[in-house]
C-alpha cells in the first residue's frame, strides 16, 4: 500500500482515483499531478515503483497545499472572517449557511436538529 502525505492509498484503485483520497486533491488536480509526473492514469496503486511514489511525493510537497496544511489554512481563514466581523464571519459564528442559501426551510445540516418552541401551537 502506497503512503502519500500521511494517507494510505487504496491498492486496487486506479491512480487517478486513489490520489483523491488525499484531502485537497480532487479528480482534476489528480489528473494534473499524474500528467506532470508522467504516470499513467490507468495504473493501479499496487503497480507503482518506489521511484514513482517518491516522484509523486516530491511533486505534491513542492507544488500543492494538502492535508494538515490546507485544513489549518481553511480554519485560519474562517477564524479571520469571524474576528473582522464580516457577514460570512457572522454566519459562521451563528452556525448558519454562509453562502446565501435559504434558511426558512432546509439548512438543517448547518443548523442542527429542530428545537421545539414552547407555547407555539399550529394554526388550524
From Swiss-Prot:
GO cellular component, one term: cytosol
InterPro entries xrefs: Rbsml_uS13_C, Ribosomal_uS13, Ribosomal_uS13-like_H2TH, Ribosomal_uS13_bac-type, Ribosomal_uS13_CS
Segments for region (Disordered): 94-124
Domain of life: Bacteria
Family from the record: Belongs to the universal ribosomal protein uS13 family.
GO biological processes: translation
Annotated signal peptide: none
Pfam families: Ribosomal_S13 (PF00416)
Molecular functions (GO terms): rRNA binding; structural constituent of ribosome; tRNA binding
Ranges in coiled-coil conformation: none
Keyword Transmembrane helix: no
The protein's assembly and partners: Part of the 30S ribosomal subunit. Forms a loose heterodimer with protein S19. Forms two bridges to the 50S subunit in the 70S ribosome.
Encoding gene per record: rpsM
Entry function: Located at the top of the head of the 30S subunit, it contacts several helices of the 16S rRNA. In the 70S ribosome it contacts the 23S rRNA (bridge B1a) and protein L5 of the 50S subunit (bridge B1b), connecting the 2 subunits; these bridges are implicated in subunit movement. Contacts the tRNAs in the A and P-sites.
Gene3D superfamilies: 1.10.8.50, 30s ribosomal protein s13, domain 2
Keywords carried by this UniProt record: Ribonucleoprotein, Ribosomal protein, RNA-binding, rRNA-binding, tRNA-binding
Name of the featured protein: Small ribosomal subunit protein uS13
